[in-house]
Amino acid sequence: MKPAARRRARECAVQALYSWQLSHNDIADVEYQFLAEQDVKDVDVLYFRELLSGVATNSAYLDGLMKPYLSRQLEELGQVEKAVLRIALFELSKRDDVPYKVAINEAIELAKTFGAEDSHKFVNGVLDKAAPVIRPHKK
């Protein structure tokens, strides 16, 4: 699959996870509604689904990975930043096929696109500290 299709999958995953985090609806319902309402012709839909289910299933684990590196409480994080960090930490911890730098760079771009003005700096700071611990020998 083309890198652009993966990037679009991540963008869609941020939006769907944002909805899931706010609504607390079943992730399968969020996925179904998102795919029914959005144009996904240039999206790696399989990867989108994998990100959604992987993050939802592992959200407590992923939150535990980020907590030591947060400058504030997890509950104080913006929903966009939380979704972006969860995706990146899922890729770093569960997807060895995604290169270390790709996961971080994609997260920074997602934060620039969807986050508040300086959220990309916050995301970068958290991932710069967490990534070497998660993947100590795989840069």
Swiss-Prot record:
<dbReference type="InterPro" id="IPR011605">
    <property type="entry name" value="NusB_fam"/>
</dbReference>
<dbReference type="GO" id="GO:0003723">
    <property type="term" value="F:RNA binding"/>
</dbReference>
<dbReference type="GO" id="GO:0005829">
    <property type="term" value="C:cytosol"/>
</dbReference>
<keyword id="KW-0805">Transcription regulation</keyword>
<keyword id="KW-0889">Transcription antitermination</keyword>
<dbReference type="InterPro" id="IPR006027">
    <property type="entry name" value="NusB_RsmB_TIM44"/>
</dbReference>
<keyword id="KW-0694">RNA-binding</keyword>
<keyword id="KW-0804">Transcription</keyword>
<dbReference type="Pfam" id="PF01029">
    <property type="entry name" value="NusB"/>
</dbReference>
<dbReference type="GO" id="GO:0031564">
    <property type="term" value="P:transcription antitermination"/>
</dbReference>
<dbReference type="InterPro" id="IPR035926">
    <property type="entry name" value="NusB-like_sf"/>
</dbReference>
<comment type="similarity">
    <text>Belongs to the NusB family.</text>
</comment>
<protein>
    <recommendedName>
        <fullName>Transcription antitermination protein NusB</fullName>
    </recommendedName>
</protein>
<dbReference type="GO" id="GO:0006353">
    <property type="term" value="P:DNA-templated transcription termination"/>
</dbReference>
<comment type="function">
    <text>Involved in transcription antitermination. Required for transcription of ribosomal RNA (rRNA) genes. Binds specifically to the boxA antiterminator sequence of the ribosomal RNA (rrn) operons.</text>
</comment>
